[in-house]
């Protein structure tokens, strides 16, 4: 009855046409606030500001150096260049002055680095300069200046940015006139700053478009790597032609493609209007903000202290993944010929020009606004019904558990199709539910090979792996290791599995809780407690039968919710499915195979890397993971195991297509509706962003229930398999209790204990800054997974390898895998295969070196089956 109801809801979700949330006509992403005015410069009676100053942040202090202005009355004075340096420390309203540059200069580029503010080029009234120097704010509250290598050419009205320690400079003019604008592109690696002989500027290939000055140079992540973006600018064709050519184009430079010797530049979308002499700044994970443009749009009275300037004050946002541009607000003041800097989580725009000849001493701080979400009663009601239903399943099956065979294996009375859905659900976590669409959204279908490689491997698992576990009638997978090798290997494997699964439970509860808290009004700890407590309740009461049946229901819920989201996204397009295919094809989002066999392909997503890595990642859970192996034993015979594999494979294939399609649909949806993006969300949270703002009330609750379902299915599999291993491999192995009822009570207690422990660890994640330390711990334990699988394969496919050789092989696999991860850039996808291979090869070779006492392995090796 429950299953039919869930199916009905799934179909209902699919046929109802979603109504997108209303889109606001005027977006406003930024909250503006004013900072202390820039003081009067040397020789001037009042603060009037400067244009073209070097601006940057170092040691949590804002530095403004140099610049040029006109004193009042503006129309009767000549431009003045300045050498003043002013510093404003964080949380202070008092400017610190009295510092000087070596000479008066303006209109260079500046970029903030951990080494200091790099000041590049510039000019004065007579000429341009190639000077480059570093300004540092030290602990003694003084400015320290360090000279750096000069530019290859004199350059002013240029712009700079960084990727890591590398400074990039693009655009600018070689002389004082605009007709000297260049197509220059240089870089310098500041990591070599302590090696003066190695520190130098490198000439890079220029973009294919026009030469330019007064452009923006910015860096941002495009879904695959951090790239350089050249935006807008202006140039003059010749000295005789005084007209400016204004630019609205964007070009992207890929450092990875350049390093590989490939064409590195790509033409991107055009801006809605030309921009020049303005500043830009990367925000979030994939946006670049463009502040105004030096195009006169408003009249102003120079004597009016409240005027907002006469240039364009619109703020544009360029999204590097969808290659779209939208207007996202308006500046309070039309500041041009200045530099935007990041100061902690804020963007600071200091001084600048607001009209021809008119500067401003005002400094404005912009903070990103985050839209609040309201989950609503309808969504909460749907989620509550789902959660209560899961507890009801546990209560129902509680009365069917008479002994440990019922609790751990469901009395082997579970249907094959339900066991198959349980295998699928155990492998699919809510991290996958969120992460796979996000990965496809920012890239393409290259990773689909990892998921589909299970199809040719499943027959191997059924024919060559399952028979060993069925023959010994295993409750714990690690019983096989004792029978084939020795008790030490069994206990070592069991203990490692328990540690890994406890940590995995904590992560599987914590990471989805972060996403769920953004979609609901619940806090992260509340989301963790809901997942943990409810899962522990139905697992403790109902045993494996409750786990398997809730897995089956959860599979239908999560796939139904996912299908509905896909339907809403495609339905939002004017052209429907055909437009979806068209936009996705234009963006190469269906690209699935990377035919790269070069020497460096081992570091990439090359097809052969995906195949070999996919084989290892598939073998590990199906050969050595108790949570999966346990499902082989919940049905009554081998034929039903085969049918469960067929069900699992079909469900996995369908889910793969759905989730990869969702990732592509997210790209298409946000390319068609870029105004619905929120820069405060990370790319990994793009699916939760869609769920939060684009789904109607009530139906959003079903999708949230799907995410909970994915989390609970993984947690339930972990907590129940831990209980199975502890009772079977430790308590029963050493006959710690006397009655079957005692073992059943111990099983329930272990389920409760380890489920609670995993929940507590997840709560610690949410309340303490130990995430990186814990991830390192899990990474170390994760090194055991490949070699652990290798132990089983050594036992099943060799007859000469004994316990000592097997242990040496496993330890060698861990060490080799650690070295590979620490000292190479090999794609992490290959880690599982590398660990398996190292364990098998070393273990087999050691069997020729170490003589071991022969033991009866009849039925435990392929040679004696």
Where are these regions (language model features)?
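Kelch-like beta-propeller repeat domains
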Residues: 23-375
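Intrinsically disordered, low-complexity regulatory regions of eukaryotic regulatory proteins
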Residues: 21-24, 623
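Generic short N-terminal amphipathic or hydrophobic helices
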Residues: 2, 14-15, 856, 861
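Short, intrinsically disordered low-complexity segments
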Residues: 3, 89, 210-211, 233, ...
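Membrane-embedded helix-loop-helix hairpins and adjacent transmembrane boundary segments
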Residues: 371-865
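Bacterial N-terminal signal peptides
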Residues: 8-18
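Bacterial N-terminal signal peptides that target proteins for export
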Residues: 1-8
